[in-house]
A protein has these predicted regions:
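Alpha-amylase-like alpha-glycosidases and glucanotransferases acting on alpha-linked glucans and related
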Residues: 1-36
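Carbohydrate-interacting/catalytic domains
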Residues: 31-45, 50-60, 64-232
Length: 232
C-alpha cells in the first residue's frame, strides 16, 4: 500500500499515522500481477535482512513472516475481525517468506557480530566500516543508491574472526560493489541474495556459493550478505 486504509474505523480515514513511507510496487492492495507480487516479496526480504543485520533487539510485527497487511489499516484497535486477526493459513501461500525469516534469524544467531560488540578481530579489521561502492569509501548522501557495511570481530567462542559484509542496492538497475580485501586464507561466501528466485523444497543455504571476484554485481533492489570463510 502507498497509503493507509482506515476507512472502516469510522473516522473517515483521519486516524492513524500518515507517514508510513510505504510503496505498493505498482498497484494498491491485492494484485494478481506476478511481477508486482515478486517485487513485493523481495522488498519484504530486503527489509528483514536489513533488520537482522542491525545492532540491538530486533523487533517485527507478528504476521510479518507471512506478509500480513491488515488490508492497509495501520490503526486496527477497533477491528476485532479479519482486519486484525492473524490468518495462519497464509503460511502456506507465503512459505517463501517464512523460510527466509527463519534462515535470517539463524544467520543472526550464528554471527554474534551482527547483534552486538564482540572482542576485536585478530585480523585488525574495524568493528564496523562503511563502503559506498568502493572499499573504505564511507561517504554517503541523499543520492546514494548502494551501500556496503562490514562487521568484524571475534566469534562468541573466541576461536575465529567473524566477518560479515552487508550490501544493499536501492536502485532499479544493477550496480557494482567493489569488495574489501580479506585477510590471507579467507574468501567471501554469498549467503543471502534476495534477487534469487525461490525454489520450494530447496533450503536457502543450498543457494550459497563462494565468490572469488573483487567486485560484486548487485541486482536491482536487492540485499546481498557475504560471510568470510577459510579457503576451500
Amino acid at each position: 500500500y502507498n497509503m493507509k486504509h482506515n476507512e472502516k474505523n469510522g473516522w473517515e480515514n483521519t486516524d492513524g499515522d500518515n507517514n508510513g513511507n510505504s510503496w505498493n510496487c505498482g498497484a494498491e492492495g491485492a494484485t494478481d500481477d506476478p511481477e508486482i507480487e515478486g517485487l513485493r516479496r523481495r522488498m519484504v526480504k530486503n527489509a528483514f535482512a536489513t533488520l537482522m543485520c542491525s545492532r540491538g533487539p530486533a523487533m517485527f510485527f507478528a504476521g510479518d513472516e507471512f506478509c500480513n497487511t491488515q488490508f492497509g489499516n495501520n490503526n486496527s484497535y477497533c477491528q476485532d475481525n479479519i482486519t486484525s486477526w492473524l490468518d495462519w493459513n497464509r503460511l502456506e501461500e507465503y512459505k517463501e517468506i517464512h523460510d527466509f525469516f527463519r534462515y535470517m534469524i539463524r544467520l543472526r544467531k550464528d554471527n554474534a557480530i551482527l547483534r552486538k560488540t564482540t572482542k576485536p578481530a585478530a585480523c585488525k579489521l574495524p568493528e564496523i566500516s562503511i563502503h559506498n561502492g568502493f572499499p573504505w569509501n564511507g561517504g554517503t548522501d541523499n543520492n546514494s543508491r548502494l551501500i556496503g557495511i562490514m562487521y568484524a570481530g571475534r566469534d562468541e567462542n573466541d576461536i575465529r574472526d567473524d566477518i560479515v559484509f552487508y550490501c544493499m542496492n536501492a536502485y532499479w538497475e544493477t550496480l557494482i560493489m567493489q569488495l574489501p580485501e580479506l585477510p590471507m586464507g579467507m574468501q567471501w561466501k554469498v549467503c543471502v541474495n534476495t534477487f534469487l528466485p525461490y525454489e520450494d523444497g530447496k533450503n536457502v543455504e543450498e543457494q550459497t556459493e563462494f565468490y572469488y571476484k573483487k567486485s560484486l554485481k548487485v541486482p536491482p533492489r536487492t540485499v546481498m550478505i557475504l560471510i568470510a570463510e577459510e579457503n576451500q
